[in-house]
């Protein structure tokens, strides 16, 4: 007989993981009424993604009186229902699928907000970057930017570089304050880096050409010297850039072979 902890883990997984819930492995255990489990799991899914949509699409929610589209409205749509058989709560794939639905739903309002497309890309990136597995215990330190040539920087999976046509960071706080006329964002090319620490903290920072180059070149195989040469940076400048990226959660260091 499996122990109580194993049974609890199986039930929790079944509630969070729709493909597992439909599997023979789960069904043959016959631990609970399948219809009741399915109803409760779908309730949890809607609640889980309601919280995330409200949090990550809060700026679009603030514009709802202009767009006529509340982001969380997709949770009652046939399109969201169609996702339910494949939903895995907290997974990056599911977060991306839900975020795409929200983006399409809000964009369809065709509101006269010039930066709406940029805003939706930003919010979608935030929601997707936040998703995925967490590290719940600190392991051995992997080194920092000055750890030596044997440590090779690697861009963390899920890190996103955004190129926007409007300077969103300058107006985001204004969207959450009382306003009569829609706050306007300056139209200028803006590069943002969106990253998440191993513990799930999402951070956004302004980026530039050198930061973008380092993020693209840090693949875990190149040394600091090699990256500096390709990116056209001095080693000291590269180390400072990398330290900032490590602090954001965008880059980690691994030992070279």
Residue ranges and their predicted role:
Residues 1-147, 197-257:
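Long, charge-rich, low-complexity alpha-helical segments
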């Amino acid at each position: 007989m499996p122990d109580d902890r194993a049974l609890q883990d199986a039930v929790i997984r079944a509630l969070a993981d729709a493909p597992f819930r439909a599997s023979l492995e789960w069904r043959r255990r016959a631990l609970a009424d399948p219809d009741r489990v399915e109803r409760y799991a779908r309730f949890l899914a809607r609640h889980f993604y309601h919280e995330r949509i409200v949090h990550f699409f809060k700026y679009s929610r603030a514009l709802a009186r202009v767009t006529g589209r509340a982001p969380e409205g997709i949770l009652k749509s046939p399109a969201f229902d169609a996702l339910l058989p494949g939903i895995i709560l907290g997974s990056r794939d599911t977060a991306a699928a839900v975020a795409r639905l929200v983006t399409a739903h809000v964009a369809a309002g065709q509101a006269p907000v010039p930066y709406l497309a940029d805003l939706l890309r930003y919010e979608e990136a935030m929601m997707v970057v936040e998703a995925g597995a967490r590290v719940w215990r600190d392991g051995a330190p992997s080194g920092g930017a000055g750890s030596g040539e044997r440590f090779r920087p690697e861009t963390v999976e899920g890190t996103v570089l955004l190129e926007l046509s409007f300077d969103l960071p300058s107006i985001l706080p204004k969207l959450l304050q009382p306003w009569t006329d829609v706050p306007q964002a300056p139209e200028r090319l803006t590069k943002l880096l969106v990253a998440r620490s191993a513990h799930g903290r999402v951070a956004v920072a302004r980026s530039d050409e050198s930061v973008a180059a380092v993020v693209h070149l840090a693949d875990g195989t190149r040394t600091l010297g090699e990256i500096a040469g390709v990116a056209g940076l001095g080693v000291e400048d590269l180390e400072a850039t990398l330290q900032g990226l490590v602090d954001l959660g965008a880059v980690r260091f691994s030992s070279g072979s």
